[in-house]
Amino acid sequence: IRDSHKKYDIKILNFSVGYLPDSKLTEKQKILDVIDELWDLGIVVVAAAGNYGPGPFSVTVPGISRKIITVGSYDDFRSGRGPTGCCIVKPEVLAPGSEILSLSNRNNGFVRKSGTSMATPIVAGAIALLLERYPKMKPEEVKLRLYNTCKRIPSQKDRNWGIVDVDKLLGIISVSYTHLTLPTICS
C-alpha cells in the first residue's frame, strides 16, 4: 500500500475486515501500527466496526485505532459498539449496512449482504467524493469535516457522531464547524 500510495497517489483505504476478538495481541498490534502509519502518510483509513455487537467494547481491530474513521451500521443490531479499551467513542460514523446489494460469483452475480463491511464502503465512497472535490485535504481535516456534517442521533450521542450526510459532507448544504476533540465516555 505504501508503494501504491506514492505511485498512484492513493488517498483513501477501505478496510472492510476486522480481527476476531480472540486473535493474538501481537497480530492486532502489527495491523494497528501499519494502519496508523498509513494515516500518518496522508491516507484516509476507513475501517469497519465489526459485527460482534451490540454490547460495549465490541469494535474490532483496526477499528479501535484513535486515528482512523470507524464505521458502524445503523440498521444492523450486530454492529460493533464502543467505547474502546481507551474509552474512545467508536464507531464515529454510521451508514446503512443491512441487505446491501453486493457482488457474488453466484446468483447471477449479485447477493444481498449485511454488516459493517457493507456500511464502510458507503462512507469511504462519500469521502472519495469529498477528496475529489478537495484533493489537498489531510486525513485529520476529512475526519473533522465528517464530524461536523454527520446527522446526529440524540439517543446515541455517547456511541457515535451520527449518520453520514453526503450532501453536507460535500458542501452542498452549508455547515458550521466546531473543533474536534475525540469524545470519551470513561472517567
Q: What label would you give each PLM region?
A:
Residues 33-36, 69, 124, 128, ...:
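Solvent-exposed, polar/charged alpha-helical surfaces in well-ordered, non-transmembrane soluble domains
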Residues 63-132, 136:
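Extracellular S/T/G-rich loop segment that most often corresponds to the catalytic His/Ser-adjacent loop
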